[in-house]
């Protein structure tokens, strides 16, 4: 399986503990493409369609029509994890550079790499 940074797949994130995002849901691959090429794992961020959640600076909204989603959704950059690529199933879409710039900014905030 060839996985690229910016790809969105369905993945089964179960089992979970506490407030972790779980179940079969879309995830965004945020790992660099060298890691994606050589590692059996991928670093991903969970995506939810629960857009009424509190808007955090670590959230990036996805327009369903523009990116081929069934519903408007939110990328949760505070919900990142490393998963085996075997958890990835169907590819949904690939996010463009404009969207990935927003993801990068939210990720930097999540990891305290920039002041907020």
Swiss-Prot record:
The record's Gene Ontology biological-process terms are:
mRNA catabolic process; rRNA catabolic process
Q: Which InterPro entries match?
A: PemK-like, Plasmid_toxin/cell-grow_inhib
* Alphabetized UniProt keyword annotations: Endonuclease, Hydrolase, Nuclease, RNA-binding, Toxin-antitoxin system
Q: What does altering residue 90 to A do?
A: Remains toxic in E.coli
Changing residue 56 to A: what effect? Not toxic in E.coli
Q: What class of enzyme is it?
A: hydrolase
Q: What does this protein do?
A: Toxic component of a type II toxin-antitoxin (TA) system. Specific for 5'-UACAU-3' sequences, cleaving after the first U. Yields cleavage products with 3' phosphate and 5' hydroxyl groups. Cannot digest substrate with a UUdUACAUAA cleavage site. Overexpression is toxic for cell growth (shown in E.coli), probably by inhibiting protein synthesis through the cleavage of single-stranded RNA. The toxicity is reversed by the antitoxin EndoAI. Toxin activity cannot be inhibited by MazE from E.coli. The EndoA-EndoAI complex does not seem to bind its own promoter.
Report the protein name in the record: Endoribonuclease EndoA
């Amino acid at each position: 399986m060839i996985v690229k940074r910016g790809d969105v797949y369905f993945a089964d994130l179960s089992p979970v503990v506490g407030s972790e995002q779980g179940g079969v849901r879309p995830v965004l691959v945020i790992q660099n493409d060298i890691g994606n090429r050589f590692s059996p794992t991928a670093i991903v961020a969970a995506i939810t369609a629960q857009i009424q959640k509190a808007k955090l600076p670590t959230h990036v909204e996805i327009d369903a029509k523009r990116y081929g989603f069934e519903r408007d959704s939110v990328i949760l950059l505070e919900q990142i994890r490393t998963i085996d690529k075997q958890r990835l199933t169907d590819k949904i879409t690939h996010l463009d550079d404009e969207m990935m710039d927003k993801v990068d900014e939210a990720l930097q905030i999540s990891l305290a790499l920039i002041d907020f």
